[in-house]
Design a protein with these regions (language model features):
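Alpha-helical segment proximal to the catalytic Tyr-Lys
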Residues: 141, 185-189, 248
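Active-site loop-to-helix junction immediately N-terminal to the catalytic Tyr of the SDR YXXXK motif
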Residues: 116, 162-170, 182, 206-207
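Substrate-binding pocket helix/loop in short-chain dehydrogenase/reductase
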Residues: 112-113, 117-125, 220
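Conserved glycine-rich cofactor-binding loop
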Residues: 22, 29-31
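Residue(s) in the substrate-gating loop at a strand-loop-helix junction
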Residues: 156
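The beta1-alpha1 cofactor-binding region of Rossmann-like NAD(H)/NADP(H)-dependent oxidoreductases
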Residues: 76-87, 118, 233-234
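Active-site helix of classical SDR
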Residues: 136, 172
Length: 279
């Protein structure tokens, strides 16, 4: 058997092949969770899906199976520790192992900072940050025993840029970015990599109200160097890379897939040529 640290173990397109791998993706009842899970399935991975209501997963589970992959669905409430532990045990038992975890389950409440309630804050931080940590902890135990794992925490461009009305959400995603680095340092010696995939602005059910506001969309597009929001398949290559042997020496990193908006360019505010430098 080729040693795990042998650089010749994989090469070329085989480095992106997930055949034989089992991936857990949380929050797969809709939106980005389904985009990410679909990409992993197309790359060869078998899938374990989760949502607070298992009934919401039936259609997507059938879609995954139609691709020739194994799939199983379980209930998971990431705000409940007992639910996390039960899910981790069920997921391990389903196909005998877990190679990949995509920590995707999340939520948001958009409000001006002065209107954010105590409950709003707790909902967002408990779901996005605390939930991600304890799901990773529960799943990583088996990965560490087997000496192999790929953990992908889903972050956001809001972890590196400030957006009005997204204070608690940005804080939760900034926490995910830091947590990713800490867990990478903790678990690297066991053969487990931990990285963060941070999408920019994508059209999802969670933010569809925003995209109904033409003025807001025009403002957003002007800030994105690539002049469009993200499309569902724009995340495919990134998640497969982080889940595969291609990223075998990559850990603790945040990969932004955001069309360049995190460069900080604010084109809408720059309408005139730059002034000549003065002496």
């Amino acid at each position: 058997m080729t040693p795990a640290n042998d650089a010749s173990a994989t090469n070329g397109s085989n480095a992106f092949d997930l055949t034989g791998k089992v991936a857990v993706v949380t929050g797969t009842s809709r939106g980005l969770g389904q985009y990410l899970a679909r990409a992993l399935a197309k790359a060869g991975a078998d899938l374990i899906l989760s949502a607070r209501n298992r009934d919401h997963l039936a259609g997507f589970e059938s879609e995954v199976k139609s691709l020739g992959r194994r799939a199983a669905s379980f209930e998971l409430d990431v705000r409940n520790h007992d639910s996390i532990l039960k899910f981790a045990a069920e997921a391990e038992a389903a196909f005998g192992k877990i190679d990949i975890l995509v920590n995707n389950a999340g939520c948001n409440v958009r409000k001006p900072a002065l209107e954010v309630s105590w409950d709003d804050w707790n909902l967002i931080l408990d779901t996005n940050l605390r939930g991600s940590f304890f799901v990773a902890q529960a799943i990583a135990r088996g990965m560490i025993q087997r000496g192999y794992g790929r953990i992908i925490n889903i972050g956001s461009v809001t972890s590196v840029s400030g957006y009005a009305g997204l204070g608690p959400y940005g804080a939760s995603r900034g926490g995910i970015r830091q947590l990713t680095m800490s867990l990478a340092d903790d678990w690297g010696k066991f053969g487990v990599t931990v990285n963060c995939l941070a999408p920019g602005w994508f059209r999802t059910e969670q933010n569809k109200v925003l995209y109904e506001n033409k003025a807001w969309v025009d403002y957003l597009i002007d800030r994105i160097p690539m002049k469009r929001p993200g499309a569902p398949n724009d995340l495919d290559g990134a998640v497969v890379f982080l889940a595969s042997e291609s990223s075998r020496y990559v850990t603790g990193q945040t990969l932004l897939v955001d069309g360049g908006i995190s460069t900080g360019a604010v084109h809408a505010l720059v309408q005139t040529p730059l002034a000549k430098p003065t002496r």
